[in-house]
């Protein structure tokens, strides 16, 4: 294992796990999502090019991936800085920033945000989904991909000495592509060498999380140090969810604040609202999985920032936690989900 054993690696360097506090395990602070632009509905093309204004926020909220400017979160560094200060004032301590290669990762800005706010920021190593893989990435062997992941954690990312502290979010489609499968295998190999945390973005199909865990297991990954993201939009059947939970990974509900009638990235999926997410978390707690649950918002577009009338990075702490208490979850359980579980996951073995 690496010299990071027993530590959490932030963009400002290793810290003691006890320093993290309440942690959001799946967010984006600076990124570009323009690779996933969705054409607007018929006769609404002009709306996709207008500046973000009060009068068109309703349209953007309903069509977030059809507005060009909305996909450029990396234009809002100052707004994100202000939001992180607000998050800290509300009791937040750390954010895992899941932007990887393919989403315009910017570790320099992450370091600046950490310095400016005092919030611990953990950067993500690796590659997003196949649609963002370069020809060079697709041409790499598993061994070469493994070397890239290890280097981003031990030496620095994006030509800097700023080091990542997790592998991921590793992007996967449904079904997996050959390039994504290689990246998963490399992720397992790097994790085996480093003892580091891993976080996965599954394809939008109930079978995707199962397929990914199988690939990781076969390649030697430590599933107990691995997070499966986006379960709110992936596995809906309770029996199937319990079957997946038995595999031993962390179960992440990370779309809090997202309440959509039509989910543009997968129209067949009925996106749950926060009340349903709370009930699903309570279900998992009652089934004995409180040690495996994580929560976040996965903010990746402008309209979800408070600057544009969105819920922001403090939504879970200010709004969701009180509702969870009202629904019978205890302070002890919520402390485990927001503090202890992230700490255990992020600590290098």
Swiss-Prot record:
Co-factor remark: Binds 2 divalent metal cations per subunit.
Catalytic activity: N-acetyltaurine + H2O = taurine + acetate; N-propanoyltaurine + H2O = propanoate + taurine; N-acetyl-L-methionine + H2O = L-methionine + acetate; N-acetyl-L-isoleucine + H2O = L-isoleucine + acetate
Cofactors that this protein relies on: a divalent metal cation
A GO BP entry: epithelial cell differentiation
GO CC terms, sorted: cytosol
EC number(s) given by UniProt: 3.1.-.-
Subcellular location: Cytoplasm, Cytosol
Source superkingdom: Eukaryota
Single GO MF annotation: zinc ion binding
Pfam families according to UniProt: PTE
Keyword Cytoplasm found: yes
Residues reported to bind a divalent metal cation 1: 26, 28, 169, 298
Disulfide-linked positions: none
Primary localization class, coarse: cytoplasm
Enzyme kind, highest EC tier: hydrolase
Record: residues binding a divalent metal cation 2: 169, 201, 230
Tissue specificity note: Expressed primarily in proximal tubules of the kidney.
Keywords (A to Z) from UniProt: Cytoplasm, Hydrolase, Metal-binding
InterPro entries from the UniProt entry: AryldialkylPase_Zn-BS (IPR017947), Metal_Hydrolase (IPR032466), Phosphotriesterase (IPR001559)
Classification via PANTHER family: PHOSPHOTRIESTERASE-RELATED, PHOSPHOTRIESTERASE-RELATED PROTEIN
Family label: Belongs to the metallo-dependent hydrolases superfamily. Phosphotriesterase family.
Its job: N-acetyltaurine hydrolase that regulates feeding by catalyzing the hydrolysis of N-acetyltaurine into taurine and acetate. N-acetyltaurine has anorexigenic and anti-obesity effects that are dependent on GFRAL receptor and GDF15. PTER also acts on other N-acetyl amino acids (Met, Ile, Leu, Val) and N-propionyltaurine, but at lower rates. Binds resiniferotoxin, a vanilloid that desensitizes nociceptive neurons.
Protein name: N-acetyltaurine hydrolase
Biological classification of the source: Eukaryota, Metazoa, Chordata, Craniata, Vertebrata
Name of the coding gene: Pter
